[in-house]
């Protein structure tokens, strides 16, 4: 993999660790409220907290998967591309069902990283 692909993929991993932080550890914070466009009262509901924390673990594992692929895997490029495609597809689904900006905010770096992986 090129240095550019590694850097972009690491940035994607950091983005997903940040999303995990918001969803799992800062569930009812002002930042989480702003990022997810939800009221603080809604975020403080027990059912929403449970759902967010569960989703946060998924996002953290995506970040961890990218770190593993970049630094430890013998199939580095294959696993990175697989995870980037997964991220892009989820962002596309989110942009169709939730907020059109998700394709750029969640998928933008992943799209750039995937494109760079072919050069």
From Swiss-Prot:
UniProt-listed InterPro entries: DUF1304
Protein origin, superkingdom: Bacteria
PANTHER family tied to this protein: BLL0914 PROTEIN (PTHR38446:SF1)
This protein's name: Uncharacterized protein YpaA
Native source organism of the sequence: Lactococcus lactis subsp. lactis (strain IL1403)
Gene name in the database record: ypaA
């Amino acid at each position: 993999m090129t240095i550019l692909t590694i850097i972009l993929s690491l940035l994607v991993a950091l983005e997903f660790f940040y999303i995990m932080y918001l969803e799992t550890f800062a569930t009812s914070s002002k930042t989480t409220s702003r990022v997810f466009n939800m009221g603080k009262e809604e975020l403080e509901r027990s059912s929403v907290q449970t759902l967010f924390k569960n989703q946060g673990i998924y996002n953290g594992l995506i970040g961890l998967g990218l770190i593993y692929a970049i630094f430890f895997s013998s199939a580095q490029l294959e696993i990175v591309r697989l995870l980037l495609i997964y991220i892009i597809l989820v962002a596309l689904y989110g942009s169709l069902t939730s907020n059109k900006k998700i394709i750029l905010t969640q998928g933008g770096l992943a799209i750039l990283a995937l494109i760079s992986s072919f050069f």
